[in-house]
């Protein structure tokens, strides 16, 4: 769903930080 996609994107950004 939309939330899953947003969460996955946020996790990527946090992991790259």
Swiss-Prot record:
It comes from the Eukaryota. One of its GO terms (cellular component) is host cell postsynaptic membrane. The modification 4-carboxyglutamate is found at residues 3-4, 6, 9, 13. Expressed by the venom duct. Transmembrane segments: none annotated. GO terms for molecular function: ion channel regulator activity; toxin activity. Keywords: Gamma-carboxyglutamic acid, Ion channel impairing toxin, Ionotropic glutamate receptor inhibitor, Neurotoxin, Postsynaptic neurotoxin, Secreted, Toxin. Coiled coil: none annotated. It is found in: Secreted. Conantokins inhibit N-methyl-D-aspartate (NMDA) receptors. The mature peptide does not contain cysteine residue. This is Conantokin-Qu. It comes from Conus quercinus.
């Amino acid at each position: 769903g939309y939330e899953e996609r947003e969460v996955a994107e946020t996790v990527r950004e946090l992991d790259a930080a």
